[in-house]
């Protein structure tokens, strides 16, 4: 008689354990869909008691501050790029080759990769000569159009 009572109890316990293991192995947790989907930690079910402890507001505040910091960084970058490229009274053509970049009137408009080891002209001694030869070949092949700004007009 005892075996008849223990066998269903044992099978019920075994099925509950297997079901629970299956749920957690697939990422299913109790109340997973009830949390706020805005914060990724809560959506993954890592902080079950976050609403009880008041941590949802903390995570929303951290997301807001990082977004605000990113917006501020991007706006500063945009302002610096605009200020660099839109200098009043400067006649700067991006397609024009600067004849003497070392004695340029606007050193910040010239190529400033001299201190960078990867892009320094010491690593590529014939860089300027090769680009000038290519420009001459292109202008000779193009005939009358020796202007380097041919593609900018279209």
UniProtKB/Swiss-Prot annotation:
It comes from the Eukaryota. One of its GO terms (molecular function) is neuropeptide hormone activity. The modification Pyrrolidone carboxylic acid is found at residue 20. Residues 91-119 are annotated as: Disordered. From late embryo to larva, expression is consistently detected in three neuronal groups: dorso-lateral neurons (DL), dorso-medial neurons (DM), and neurons in the ventral nerve cord (vCrz). Both the vCrz and DM groups die via programmed cell death during metamorphosis, whereas the DL neurons persist to adulthood. In adults, expression is seen in a cluster of six to eight neurons per lobe in the pars lateralis (DLP), in numerous neuronal cells in the optic lobes, and in a novel group of four abdominal ganglionic neurons present only in males (ms-aCrz). It holds the Pfam family Corazonin. The modification Asparagine amide is found at residue 30. GO terms for cellular component: extracellular region; extracellular space. Residues 1-19 form the signal peptide. The keyword Secreted applies. Keywords: Amidation, Cleavage on pair of basic residues, Neuropeptide, Pyrrolidone carboxylic acid, Secreted, Signal. InterPro entries: Procorazonin. Residues 109-119 have a biased composition (Polar residues). One of its GO terms (biological process) is neuropeptide signaling pathway. The keyword Nucleus does not apply. Residues 70-154 form a propeptide. Cardioactive peptide. Corazonin is probably involved in the physiological regulation of the heart beat. Clock (Clk) and cycle (cyc) proteins negatively regulate Crz transcription in a cell-specific manner. Belongs to the corazonin family. This is Pro-corazonin. The lineage of its organism: Eukaryota, Metazoa, Ecdysozoa, Arthropoda, Hexapoda.
